[in-house]
């Protein structure tokens, strides 16, 4: 019986080196929210260097995908093979379990602080000299004030804005729901443009010149102030505010299929390291490391934070009550059009 000698021919040295080089190269895709580009552009290179150092020179490349976090989660459910998610809303991570079983039910317990390596709150960006004299949420319902923030239907950023405004009004009105709804109707009526994501809202305010106040994460408004320094924007942090957590997770089914589980876990754990936490505060995000926050105290004004769960119940309840079709948001928008 003839033997096909070609099948038994050993690989050449060049071929073996090529295969070895391919085996050592790892690529991660980080699916993130719309306004995190600059943060991860700063975080990724030092981790890539640390990975090479810890893994015998193996090369790791981290690629980024950015959009509104809800749109990002939907893209993964539709087939985007992201290895890790770094979002600004718990529900946008949870849906990867609920709708796709891509992560386990207990994903939030796998990393510290409910898998949230950093957090933020809401800030107001006003034009030079604060011409509309904006200081707190109550100033945002005046008839002469025009607001810019994304659509809460598509943006986690905007959902926090909506809930922060509702919570502040609820506190001010002593829990009178009718008064809070009246406040929220005018608040939403004052929105000049609803963009789909936070970065679009930034462009509308800073480049198109629309609106008197841009509402976004404290981190985002501070970075915009620096980016557009010539325009003299000013940042206002209201007295009552919301705790906005930024949950992260490796996408189990994807990392197993991609062979990237080790790198994905190492990457997200590294976000809690002193090096990463320090970089994070440079971009005006708050962290749960008191030593690092103490060194950056001048960046972060004191504000009274409330948790979504304390004021509104669980996130599934929040989504059903406020943001589902026919929910409170839709009712308030309809009332504002009358």
Swiss-Prot record:
Organism, as annotated: Salmonella typhimurium (strain LT2 / SGSC1412 / ATCC 700720)
Assembly and oligomerization: The complex is composed of two ATP-binding proteins (CysA), two transmembrane proteins (CysT and CysW) and a solute-binding protein (CysP).
NCBIfam families per UniProt: 3a0106s03, PRK10752.1, PRK10852.1
Family: Belongs to the prokaryotic sulfate-binding protein family.
UniProt subcellular location: Periplasm
Signal peptide location: 1-25
PROSITE patterns (alphabetical): PROK_SULFATE_BIND_1, PROK_SULFATE_BIND_2
Primary location: periplasm
Keyword Zinc in record: no
Keyword Transport: yes
Domain of life: Bacteria
GO MF term set: molecular carrier activity; sulfate binding
Record-given protein name: Thiosulfate-binding protein
GO biological process: sulfate transmembrane transport; sulfur compound metabolic process
The entry's keywords: Periplasm, Signal, Sulfate transport, Transport
Its biological purpose: Part of the ABC transporter complex CysAWTP (TC 3.A.1.6.1) involved in sulfate/thiosulfate import. This protein specifically binds thiosulfate and is involved in its transmembrane transport.
GO-annotated cellular components: extracellular space; outer membrane-bounded periplasmic space
């Amino acid at each position: 019986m003839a033997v096909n000698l070609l099948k038994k021919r050993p690989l050449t040295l060049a071929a073996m080196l090529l295969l070895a080089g391919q085996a050592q190269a790892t690529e991660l895709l980080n699916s993130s929210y719309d306004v995190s580009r600059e943060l991860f552009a700063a975080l990724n290179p030092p981790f890539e260097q640390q990975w090479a150092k810890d893994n015998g020179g193996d090369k790791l490349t981290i690629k980024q995908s950015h959009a509104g976090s809800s749109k990002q989660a939907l893209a993964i459910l539709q087939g985007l093979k992201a290895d890790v998610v770094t979002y600004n809303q718990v529900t946008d991570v949870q849906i990867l379990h609920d709708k796709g079983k891509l992560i386990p039910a207990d994903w939030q317990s796998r990393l510290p602080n409910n898998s949230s390596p950093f957090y933020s709150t809401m800030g107001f960006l006003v034009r030079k000299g604060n011409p509309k004299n904006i200081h707190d949420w109550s100033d945002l319902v005046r008839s002469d004030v025009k607001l810019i923030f994304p659509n809460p239907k598509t943006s986690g950023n905007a959902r926090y804005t909506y809930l922060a405004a509702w919570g502040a009004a609820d506190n001010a009105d002593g829990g009178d729901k009718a008064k809070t709804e009246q406040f929220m109707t005018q608040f939403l009526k004052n929105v000049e443009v609803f963009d789909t994501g936070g970065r679009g809202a930034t462009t509308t305010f800073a480049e198109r010149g629309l609106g008197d106040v841009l509402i976004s994460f404290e981190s985002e408004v501070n970075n915009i102030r620096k980016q557009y320094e010539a325009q003299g924007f000013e940042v206002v942090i209201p007295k009552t505010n919301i705790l906005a957590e930024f949950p992260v997770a490796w996408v189990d089914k994807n990392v197993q299929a991609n062979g990237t589980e080790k790198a994905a876990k190492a990457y997200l754990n590294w976000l809690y390291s002193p090096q990463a936490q320090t970089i994070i505060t440079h971009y005006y995000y708050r962290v749960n490391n008191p030593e690092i926050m103490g060194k950056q105290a001048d960046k972060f004004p004191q504000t009274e934070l409330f948790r979504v769960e304390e004021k509104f119940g669980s996130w599934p309840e929040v989504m059903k009550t406020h943001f589902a079709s026919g929910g409170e948001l839709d009712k308030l928008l309809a009332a504002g059009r009358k």
